[in-house]
Amino acid sequence: MATSLAAQLAQIAAKSRSSLNVKAQKAAHTKSLIFEPRIAAGQSYQTIYTACRDGFEELCQLDARFTPFSNTLFSEQSQDEDRSQMTQAENKELDRRVDSFLRLVGSRLRLMPAIKAIEWLIRRFRIHEFNTSTLLATFLPYHSIPAFVTLLSILPADLPQQYKFLAPYVRSLTAPPRAAIVYQATHHREFLTAITEYTLDACRNKQQYPALVSFWAGVMTEAVNGRIDINRSGRQGVQLDNDLALIALVSKPLGDAMTMKDVPDIQIAAYMVVSLLAAKANFDDKLLSVFMEQLVIGWTAETVRPGLVCLSILAQYRAPKQLSSRVAKALLKMDDLPQRLVDASKQCRVDKLAYALVLALADRLAKKGDARGLPIIKSILLLELLQEKLGKVAFKSLLRAALKMTDEVDQDGSARKQLGSTLVLLSQSAGATGVMVRQVIEDEDYDIEGLELRLDTSFGPRRLLEDKPAEEDAKDLEVRQDPKETLEAAIERLAVPPRSVKSFLSQKSDQLFDDMCKVLLSVATDPDDLLKFDEAPFLCRQTAHDDSYYFSFYMRVWCGPYPTLIRSAALEMAKRRLKQGDCAALDLQAMIPYCVAALSDPAKKVRQAAADLITVLSKSNAEGIETAKRPIWASKQLYEQSNEQTWMNPAASRALLQEIIVPALEESVLDEEHISNVLRSHLQSTKDSATGPQLSSAVRLSIFSCITSHVVHTPLLAVKSRLLKPTNQVDSVSKATRTSLLLPLLRWWASLSSTEAAQLCERERIDESKFNQSCVNVAVANDKPGLETLFEIITNSSAWTREGLVEAAFARTRKIWSTIKSDSKLKLALSMLDLAQTPATAGSSAEFVSEEAADFLRNVDLTTNILNAFLESLQDIPKITTDSPATKRRRTSSSDHSRGVSLQATNAVKAALNKVTFVLQLVEGSKPAEHPELLQSLFVTLADLQVLRSQVGSELGYLQNLVLSSLLAMMPTYKNNKSLKIDTSVGHGDVLVQCIQKSSSPAVQNSALLLVASLANTAPDVVLHSVMPIFTFMGGSVLRQSDDYSAHVVVQTIKEVIPPLVETFRKSRRNLVTSAAELLSSFVIAYEHIPSHRKRDMFISLIENLGPKDFLAALVAMFVDKYGTTDSMVAFCKDLMNSFGVEVQLQSLVMLLDLVSDCLQPKPTLAATLFNRNTDDDQDLHKTALKELTLLPKVLSSRQLRTEVSQLAGRDDMEASKFRELYASLLEKILTLAETVKTNKALHARCSDTLAGLLNLLSIGEFIKAVENLLDRPSISLRQKVLRTLEVRVDQESNTDADSRTVLLAFLPQLTAVIRDSDDIAYKHTAVACVDKIAEKYGKKDLEAVAAAATTIAGDCCLGQPDKRLRVMALLCLASLVDVLQDGIVPTLPVSLPKALSYLSESLQGEKEPELHNAVYSFFESLAVHVPYMLTKTYIGQLLAVSNVSAEANMSDESSQARFGCLQLLANQVDANTMLAALEQNWAQAVNAGFSAVEEYLKLLATVLDKHPSTIIAKHISTLSTIFLSALDLRRNVQSKDTVSIAALAKLTEIEALINDVALKMIYKLNDSKFRTVFTQLMEWVATGLPKDDKLGKVLRHQSVYSFLLAFFDNLKDVVASYASYIIDDATAILKASDPSKMEDRELWQLVLKTLARCFEHDSGGFWQVPAHFEAVSGLLVEQLEHAAALGELPGGDLVQNAVVGLAEAAASRDHRKELNAAVLRRLRSPSASVRLAAVRCEQSLTDTLGEDWLEMLSEMLPYISELQDDDDEDVEKETHRWITKIEAILGESLDAMLQ
């Protein structure tokens, strides 16, 4: 029972958030988002509230929705609220407010005010404990920010179940990655549900924000995607269960999200998830349909676009069936749905959605008569949104809907009428849709005829007029609403009135025909009623052979806009009647044109019926029957003007029927266009007939005349249109043109008003535009009346209301333009120009005609005569503005008249400018190159424009550019056709100069410049006398433009103008450069204004066209003179030079040197002109010369130039020969100039630089060829410069260049000869440097030559010379040669080594010479590397001796490093025997030199010891021992001679430490037996090596030895513990004899104590436990306490204690310790207080170190301790008490009882 109760209480405690534990409460109070726990712990709620309230108020300023919380969560009262004291209802209400606030503040979490506000809720209301889920959901979208990690740090240990995945991140205090969140949402539905509910709640309360929605959408999408992948299963049952689980999880939240109309973001996010589900989840159609309905219920104007995309995706994964009524209705309400579907199709497929919509709308149409969807269906099909298969099914659904519709669902028939219009439009549409629809109509077994009757329409190619007048709609409605009339009543009604109509092909019959047609339409579907109708009296069937009444009725029907069934029935009735015998005797040719029209019917059924009719007709007109006597049927009755009708002769009638039509019947039935093609082919000339017999001209003329006559007289536009197809393709038959025969038709059609024409077309459902085209096509080019009629239509303002007809007339005229005669063309063109310039108001017919006329002129080929006439009409235009000044004066008047005149003048100017613009545009668009004769007129126009420009105050840039562009286009024609000449006397060049100079338009300037360029190339005499002002102008304008076109203009102008201009200069026999100076100056001045990316190409073009050989140098010189030798200018000049060949560049450099020489002349000629200087201004020209010379070496240093020169120099041809000549000339000139200006340092220096650059220009081989000649020159300085250049060149050469190697090695003997024979030291120096470089790079390839050079350099002629620079160079060179020759250097060493050592010694005497010093060491260093065996003991000894002096000579760091590096290398390379012997010999000298020398000596010795193995070291132990003992005697040798300073003593101590280190290095390489001998010798040496009376010497030597022993025992430790036996006697003797109060003894005394202490410390083998060893030192050591006491405050007193303690530790024997203790205790009763104090302190140390082991002898100590407690000396008493304290601490008890 107790256990159960305890468990229950534990569970309650675990779940409880209240705690009576004060520590727990304090810990909870430290949880903070902002403050550190230590700060938070000390904060009161008042403090927290004050800090957080500021943040909340800032939030209120950002968003007013936070304000209500100021009365609740952030009120003053909230400071006193405690959740633990609230009721459950109060806590629930608080949770609701907290949740609301958190959802609202989520969008501001990146702002500090939001964090502050949440801080208050955490601190006061502990929301991190009570509202953990909401708090985490609020922060989760920001899981990557630092605040989220801070939140994790304050969360309770027990997280909510859905957030337990955060536990690892809470422990590590790291932000969870997005992948972890997505994984949790994918695998744990409770987490996904939690964030979904949080997000949707925020949206419902309008508290959402983009970051939250985006986070939810991303996680939801990835989670759903992951769940789909996880749930996939091969077992259908398992897959179904998984799908149901997924549906249960996401369907409701997604449905809720999609219906939140106020939150478009969440809707779009839901669309994304739904799209994913549809694409991957394989849901059934029912669920997809539900999603579709939810989507359309909720979408808004903002979300309809993405919603439509989502809907399309859903439909795509759904079976292809119609949409639900709700979805279809929603789509039906959408504006511009087809276009939206097109837009959506760019993102996804929409075909299934469009298909399902069409099915749904068709179903609504059939069941409800709802025709609102028809426009949508029509657009979907026409826009080809459906695949062909779906499109066919969709169209079939429309046909089925049409068949299903009844009067019940469509009472007024409007829906069926709209459906019929839609079906007809689709069937007649162009493109893939029309083809597909027509195929469906033909392939499917539909009752199309019945459908046409049902819909009151016809499926054909004629366009339906969509809008009928309202009156007709009303009439149709009335008719439909009337009760249905019976056939009998109709027959009776129609038979009552008397017949006054003879033919239905007249206007008088229209009303009667309409009435009869209605009856026919009503009976067409019933064959019996149709026969009754046919035999009705009012049709006069019985008299059909006598009058035209019967047949004309049916002829009009089958050619009319009626259903196919009616049209075919009419043909059938006519055929039936023709079979009767009374028709056999008639010539029925009047019916043939109408039969031909029927054969062109779009309905195959009608064509078949027409073919049957023609077959019957042909039988009655068979050849066997006598046709000549047959009367022509209806020849007087058919038309109202039948007497004007032309009829065929019998032969022609028979030929038309039997030979043309009947053979083509079968194909005509299949193709409606076939009959027209057949007629055309037979009516054209006989030789063009495609097939069949050839017809005579008379027959063809008769047929053609008859058909065209029917076209003119028939009232049926359909018949006219169909018969015009073949006739309009026949220009003429015999002498009769189609225009002469059909012109009445065109005139009749043109005479109609727009209303009349529209009514006629509407009645017969004819496309008016096509009929207009057919009518105007009757006019042909060679028929004047036809052309005049077209002109009349175009120019007659009364016809302008027929815009379609006028447009067709323009189009026809444009089409026949090329075949119109020239005079007619000119007349027509001028008329068109007048029409194009006719003033008109906007939107008027006149404006339309004006635009058409202008368009006509723009699109026809205008002849030269026409264009010239146009231009001539412009020549008086400048006169228009001559009254402008008066006009301006009259403007000051207030009279209306003056204002009218002003306005009139302004309008006239405007009209004139419009005409000029139009004409010039026509000229430009007419390919001016094909009309070169216009050039003169265009120049006149350009001149007139200059006048007009100044008068109207406008630039007229566009007009000028039109003229200039036309002139430019003509230039190639003039250039290619030499027969065309340009008149040079007219002054075209002056006009262009004026145009260029006075125009501010860059386009005009560019065009004019291009024209100047073209003229300069084509006819230079026209413009060359005017070009200089043009170039001056270019420098200030066009050159500064940055566009590509301006750059092209400049280049083109340069290309075309400059060459002929230069040729003119050449002919003038003046200096070419001087003549062009002004031209060059204009370009140079413009340089800084030219865009940087244009400069190079433009100036290269300029130079190329001027001639680079003549002008490159001049232009570069002017650049440098004008802009100086800045980096940018030098780079530009180098670039210019590099753009040309080597020959040109060298020639230019020669010219530059000539120009510089001219500048330095007393009376310069070319330079003064070129640089525009006064010849008296010498200083200015000298500055210019300096600039030019500054440029030269920089040009010569061009890498590109060097490359080209190297390629050229290797050849042996004329070009290479020319190059060498130029090179020689350039070299000669620079040398001459250098000699001339040697008094001017600046100029001379530039000459030297130029010379160096010139010499560097050649390859090393070619260069040496030049050098060999130059070395024979008498000028030493020149030869020296050449060799210096060679040195630099060698340094630059590649090691792998075989050619360079061969040449340079071959040159070595010559350099050797220079060194040997020359008396000039500087020259020798340079030669040695050259040898050094050559040998270093290539010496190994010719050791013999290098050895010879080395011998020479080592000899007296070089190394033996007194010049120190030469010595340095020789030594450095020898060092390099050692590297090359190695053993081969040996022969020179007997000569060079003594000199080198001598020079080293000299370098340290007097004024030091570090260069020589370092050179010697460099030489020895090379020897040490390559021939160390040649360095004997003598040489090394001498070197070490001099090095000792160097070490003490205070040389620079560089010199010291050179010396020490060399010595170190010697120590490593030279044999140990030689090196150690030299070192042994050199010790005394090093000591005499100084401490630095000794220090280097010891370092060298250390290097030797490190370098050689122990076997070598052991062999030389004797030498090393000697050196070692000498080193240990250093202190005695130094201190015994003179008084030594403190600094010297310190240095001596450092050196002794170094000696000890070196000695240890030696010891490490010796075995015990070898070293014991050395050690024994050492101890003997220190003990007996000096006379007894040399006490100071002995002390100093002992100091050095014991310093070594201290290091020895300290480093080798217990390994050498036994060596202590060798020092016991000596050490005890020293301790006995030493008086530490004396400074010289005290140092040794301290060293001995330290050494003994180290021996004691490292005794691990029991050496000091041996009684003899212990007793030898124990008593003596204790006695030293008295010496330590005597020292007082002097250093060293504690050493005795350390030694005693060490001995006590090492002894490790009770007896030894007791003996030692007794000896110390005896000192406690010493009469000297200082001795007692020292003994007490010694006991303290022993007690501290040995502890209880030492206190075993406490009983012996107690009496002494007791006495010491009352010691007379206060210090002794204090130390005693301290000793007692330590004893008590160790024993753990007080000594008071023992001491009593």
From Swiss-Prot:
HEAT repeats lie at residues 586-623, 656-692, 861-898, 983-1021, 1052-1089, 1161-1198, 1258-1295, 1302-1340, 1344-1383, 1492-1529, 1711-1748, 1752-1789. Residues 881-901 are annotated as: Disordered. The keyword rRNA processing applies. One of its GO terms (biological process) is ribosome biogenesis. One of its GO terms (cellular component) is small-subunit processome. It is found in: Nucleus, Nucleolus. Keywords: Nucleus, Repeat, Ribonucleoprotein, Ribosome biogenesis, rRNA processing. One of its GO terms (molecular function) is snoRNA binding. Pfam families: BP28CT, HEAT_HEATR1, U3snoRNP10. Component of the ribosomal small subunit (SSU) processome. PANTHER family: BAP28, HEAT REPEAT-CONTAINING PROTEIN 1. Involved in nucleolar processing of pre-18S ribosomal RNA. Involved in ribosome biosynthesis. Belongs to the HEATR1/UTP10 family. This is U3 small nucleolar RNA-associated protein 10. It comes from Pyricularia oryzae (strain 70-15 / ATCC MYA-4617 / FGSC 8958). The gene is UTP10.
